[in-house]
Amino acid sequence: MELTQQVKRLKMQKNNFLNQYYELESYISKIAPNRIEQYKKNIENIEKDIEVAKKYHTDDFHIKVLDKYDSDTRAEANKIIRNIQPSYKNERKIASYQGFDIILDRKSVYSHQTMIIRGNYDYEFEFSGSTNIMYQIDKIIEYGILEELKTFKRRLEFESRKFTTAKTELNPDFPHENELIKKQARLSELNQKLSA
């Protein structure tokens, strides 16, 4: 009876081991390479946006909203942008500013709306009626893009280490295989004797 329980336990351990093995194999062959490739692409795009931000950076303020409202002050631009109603499309380009497209996104939560600063990569923030929108946009262009770059570099480093570790740990051999084979053989032998 105890031998039967030991064999059942070892079979369960082997099934768990094989499930983990196949998950790790999938991670190594598909998931990790795709993530690493995406992180590298994001880093490359964000680095391009940093160059755009440097190129267009100026202390003079000017923004053209909806191709018809010119504004030379942040306060006036805030007022114009705040009064734009989200369109029935998901996204609506409302302005170009310092080399980036400013997009109003229809997805909203309660009294908040989403704004996207689009370059080679998208930088999102939510705002409500009281938000200083131009301050948020300036802050993202000046600091947020660099923070996003740091975040993806950390993710890439972490994922690369995890990928390397996973490759060294991948082993299809169940560590208790010999024990399982011996106990199964012994159990079969006992069952044959009991049947006779």
What is each residue range found by the language model?
Residues 1-70:
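C-terminal accessory region of SF2 helicases/translocases
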Residues 48-103, 185-194:
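Extended, charge-rich alpha-helical segments
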